[in-house]
């Protein structure tokens, strides 16, 4: 008891001491010092900064998006590959990484099983992808073909690849935009993949070119053509000492004009007389276009092709349409014309910037064979006219807004799903709006022609006119005040920005009594013109003097006169 009394008395004294003003002050000072020292230590160790970062808006957004993504239920594919076959694939991968190019053959295909929706489906499987970005990390790219009569997600053949290899959600947006315009588009989804018990997360699933693709796009079955790339990649694969993207054609055997034209499912089309006829007709059309024997309209559905090119410009998506190895064309047996199929839209190594395929066609810095391939289309005035008309339509105010609203039900669930692994992803519609603005400016720059007077005579003005930019123009007349003086339309070709202007002499009929120029060099006369295919008429001022000034001969005479 005494001991307890003594302990109680000690406790009461301690409490009394703490209650004193002086003691409270010292306790506060001591506490502050402890907190300060702890704070310094935490700062040095990065603990405090980590805590602050953990509560930052960016971190909260990331966590929220990941959690939202976890509420999604992507289709799940469980792939079982025998150990021996998997090691064979791993060896192929190592060889490809050394070459920095993947070369595959029928001997590289292995058997596997895919478990999906409660069923086990036998498949054939191989690695896929040309460059080795398809083989980096754990998410290797695969081509899968369901055996016998089986299908997976309604497809007989498809590819599985890291979503990044096709620029995540942007590839799906491109296909859905094409589908909305009535063009042939692949099915493109995101699925959860497990291989031999290892959960690899989300893959992009891309439909492969075969009958079901055509039927899913509500077309009658017909061959899908391509330019065979085997020689191209074989030539590039041998250049092992050169970085992949710096490799080129040594002798040209892997180029556009040398590539064999082939079809997917060739054996199927050659199996029957009717199929063989379609196959040969389709190849003849594409071959004749390549050699310049037929026009664009004679080989292709020219309206669909123009829309395809214009939409690719709107989405800055040229990797497929602008490079001949990626070109895919469906032969429509009803119209006997080729139609483009959207595929492999984005070059994920180079950020997309606004531009036009028409400009790429004359850009001398571009790969020569791909430029020649594209320029064949734009050499056809009828196609160029439709292309520009489609550019005006898809770049008009409101088109992108309507597209965004229409595609939201398709894209938003996929984006939410992707954010399970890639929470920073957005659907960037502002870049599409910037591309639309670029198109409008390219079609209607502040001034597209320069015009100078050569001679003036009763009833006629002779003018030198030059196109200042890349798109071809139609010169359609003169205007002064409210008076319009039409002339026979004359076409002026475009030019690359590295080339000088080329002046063309054009005669403009004018009414009798029309006087120009007057005593002053200022003139109200304007040249009226249109970009080929555009509905808009633009004007530019005409100069009342020669673009050559005094002329070279007169300059030489003056130089002699002024010589000492």
Which positions does each model-derived feature cover?
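Phosphate/dinucleotide-binding and metal-coordinating scaffold of catalytic cores
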Residues: 2-4, 14-564
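Short polybasic linear motifs
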Residues: 10-11
């Amino acid at each position: 008891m005494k001991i307890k009394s003594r302990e109680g008395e000690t406790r009461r004294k301690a409490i009394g001491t703490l209650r004193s003003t002086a003691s409270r002050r010292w306790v506060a000072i001591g506490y502050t010092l402890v907190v300060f020292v702890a704070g310094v230590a935490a700062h040095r160790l990065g603990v405090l900064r980590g805590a602050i970062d953990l509560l930052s808006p960016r971190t909260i957004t990331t966590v929220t998006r990941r959690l939202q993504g976890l509420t999604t239920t992507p289709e799940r594919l469980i792939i079982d590959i025998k150990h021996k076959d998997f090691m064979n694939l791993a060896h192929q991968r190592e060889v490809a990484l050394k070459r920095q190019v993947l070369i595959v053959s029928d001997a590289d295909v292995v058997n596997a099983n895919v478990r999906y929706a409660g069923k086990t489906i036998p498949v054939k499987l191989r690695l896929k992808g040309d460059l080795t970005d398809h083989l980096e990390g754990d998410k290797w790219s695969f081509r899968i073909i369901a055996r016998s009569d089986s299908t997976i997600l309604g497809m007989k053949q498809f590819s599985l690849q890291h979503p990044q290899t096709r620029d995540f959600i942007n590839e799906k947006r491109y296909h859905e935009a094409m589908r909305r315009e009535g063009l042939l588009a692949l099915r493109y989804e995101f699925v959860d993949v497990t291989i031999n018990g290892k959960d690899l997360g989300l893959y992009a699933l891309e439909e492969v070119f075969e009958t079901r693709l055509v039927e899913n796009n509500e077309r009658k079955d017909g061959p899908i053509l391509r330019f065979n790339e085997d020689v191209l990649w074989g030539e590039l694969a041998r250049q092992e000492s050169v970085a992949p993207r710096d490799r080129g054609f040594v002798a040209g055997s892997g180029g556009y004009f040398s590539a064999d034209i082939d079809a997917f499912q060739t054996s199927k089309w050659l199996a029957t007389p009717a199929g063989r006829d379609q196959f040969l007709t389709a190849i003849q059309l594409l071959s004749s276009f390549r050699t310049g024997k037929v026009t664009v309209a004679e080989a292709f559905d020219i309206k669909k092709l123009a829309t395809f090119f214009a939409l690719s410009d709107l989405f800055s998506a040229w990797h497929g349409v602008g490079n001949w190895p990626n070109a895919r064309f469906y032969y429509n047996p009803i119209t006997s014309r080729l139609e483009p199929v959207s595929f492999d839209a984005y070059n994920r190594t180079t950020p997309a910037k606004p531009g036009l395929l028409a400009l790429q066609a004359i850009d001398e810095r571009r790969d020569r064979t791909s430029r020649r391939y594209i320029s064949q289309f734009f050499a056809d005035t009828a196609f160029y006219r439709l292309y520009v008309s489609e550019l005006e339509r898809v770049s008009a105010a409101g088109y992108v807004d309507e597209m965004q609203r229409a595609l939201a039900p398709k894209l938003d669930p996929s984006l939410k799903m992707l954010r399970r692994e890639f929470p920073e992803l957005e659907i960037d519609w502002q870049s599409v709006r910037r591309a639309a603005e670029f198109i409008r400016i390219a079609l209607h720059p502040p001034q597209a022609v320069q015009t100078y007077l050569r001679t003036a005579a009763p009833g006629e003005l002779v003018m030198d006119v030059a196109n200042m930019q890349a798109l071809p123009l139609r010169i359609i007349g003169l205007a002064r005040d409210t008076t319009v003086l039409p002339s026979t339309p004359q076409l002026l070709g475009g030019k690359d920005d590295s080339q000088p202007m080329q002046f063309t002499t054009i005669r403009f009929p004018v009414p009798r009594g029309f006087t120009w120029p007057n005593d002053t060099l200022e003139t109200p006369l304007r040249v009226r013109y249109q970009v080929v295919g555009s509905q808009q008429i633009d004007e530019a001022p005409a100069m009342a003097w020669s673009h050559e000034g005094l002329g070279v001969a007169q300059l030489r005479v003056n130089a002699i006169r002024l010589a000492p």
